[in-house]
Amino acid sequence: MKKQDLSVKNVVAMGIGSAIYVILTRFTSIPTPIPNTNIELVFPFLALFAAIYGAKVGFAVGFIGHTLSDFIMYGQTWWSWVLATGVLGLIIGLASKKLDLKNGIFGIKQILLFNIVQIFANIIAWIVVAPIGDIIIYSEPANKVFVQGISATLSNGITILVVGTLLLKAYAGTKIKKGSLRKED
């Protein structure tokens, strides 16, 4: 099996993506009535990076970006949710091979696939990883963390469905479709 190293492009994407993650978290979070749970417009951006660059970059941008934003904004990091954010980017990134964004293709089939995957990823991240991590690491009450997880799943799923789909459609629109260029006679 061939060892795959990270390319310079992917490392740069991780750094830029993490920095943008921090900025978006700082200035675009919308509070909800559920304690410590916000509507986060950063997650469609994470989905975009994961879909373009793949699972490693998706995980790293989510994990590093969330770590930095927690530390900068709160002075401490909530590791269970940081890991959940990384898992969200990882799962969306794993499915990116099925999307043909680099060839400018993001039609109904790809939109459906992307949204099925992102909903699944949100469920795993926010209803499994984050609450179980909260219970194990921080001894948080189960009823509280699962309500937070369900709220995060719904809000993040909807923001990625709407804004993430629009971002991916716009990105695919900037790419030249395979076979669209023809040699003139």
From Swiss-Prot:
Transmembrane segments: 11-31, 45-65, 72-92, 111-131, 145-165
Cross-referenced InterPro entries: ECF_substrate-spec-like, UPF0397
Entry GO CC: plasma membrane
Keywords tagged on the record: Cell membrane, Membrane, Transmembrane, Transmembrane helix
Pfam families in the record: ECF-ribofla_trS
Localization (cell): Cell membrane
Membrane topology: Multi-pass membrane protein
Protein family according to the UniProt entry: Belongs to the UPF0397 family.
NCBIfam families, per the entry: PRK13661.1
HAMAP family reported for this sequence: UPF0397
Name of this protein: UPF0397 protein lhv_0999
Organism expressing this protein natively: Lactobacillus helveticus (strain DPC 4571)
